[in-house]
Regions:
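Interhelical loop and helix-boundary elements at the membrane-water interface
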Residues: 2-19, 64-87, 120-147
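Core segments of transmembrane alpha-helices
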Residues: 21-25, 87-94, 144-155
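Central hydrophobic cores of alpha-helical transmembrane segments in multi-pass inner-membrane proteins
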Residues: 24-28, 46-59, 92-94, 114-122
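Short, hydrophobic transmembrane alpha-helix segments
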Residues: 28-41, 100-101
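Membrane-embedded alpha-helical segments that form the functional core of polytopic membrane enzymes
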Residues: 35-56, 111-116, 168-187
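Glycine/small-residue-rich interface belts in oligomeric ring/scaffold proteins
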Residues: 43-75
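Transmembrane helix-loop-helix
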Residues: 85-127
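Functional transmembrane core segments of multi-pass inner-membrane proteins
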Residues: 142-187
Length: 187
């Protein structure tokens, strides 16, 4: 029984399904606070985008010998490499039809968030012979993570609501919601 529970938890946590569900939950909080019906297509997009990006991140950061890593997560991911690749590919392909159901304004915001997320993960700077990404710059990692989560889980649902439901949310309320979520994630 313990073994099955452990394997299930390992799968949910290390495959990044849990973190993708957390992103959906954060967007659901936004809908709840605004007292509106959640957009299932946007929630699906958010789930698969989070799953793809987090898996992409770990696959890019593959250590030389992951099987001897001191971190159980790294050992699990690379001992289930094909599963991780499969989940990532399914996630990416799931984004295509969902993107067609989102507004142009939402897609522009998503393009910005995708750019930030990829730049965060890719080694775009070179110092000596070593390459670094934005995540390696002291102090910016927490800011970028909190910004990406608050924009994708608060601003994105609001932008989509304003584009499709023809409702207007006061700018002050939007800023307050985004700032509160930013601080929540950063805490």
């Amino acid at each position: 029984m313990k073994s099955i529970l452990r394997q299930t938890l390992d799968f949910l946590l290390f495959s990044n399904i849990f973190i993708a569900l957390c992103a959906v939950a954060q967007a659901m909080v936004t809908y709840q606070l605004l007292d509106v019906e959640p957009d299932k297509y946007l929630l699906g997009f958010l789930f698969f985008a989070t799953l793809a990006m987090y898996n992409f991140s770990i696959l890019l950061a593959k250590p030389k010998n992951p099987q001897v890593s001191p971190h159980r997560r790294v050992r699990w991911i690379f001992s289930h490499y094909r599963l991780t690749i499969t989940i990532t590919i399914i996630s990416v392909f799931s984004l295509i039809p969902l993107a067609l159901l989102l507004s142009t304004t939402s897609l522009v915001l998503l393009a910005f968030l995708a750019f930030v997320s990829v730049a965060y993960n890719l080694p775009i700077f070179t110092i000596g012979e070593k390459r670094y990404g934005l995540r390696n710059i002291p102090g910016i990692k927490l800011f970028l993570i909190a910004m990406t989560w608050s924009l994708s889980c608060v601003l994105l649902p609001i932008v989509e609501l304003e584009s499709t439901e023809l409702i207007t949310i006061p700018t002050g309320d939007i800023i307050l919601l985004v700032a509160k979520r930013f601080l929540f994630v950063a805490a």
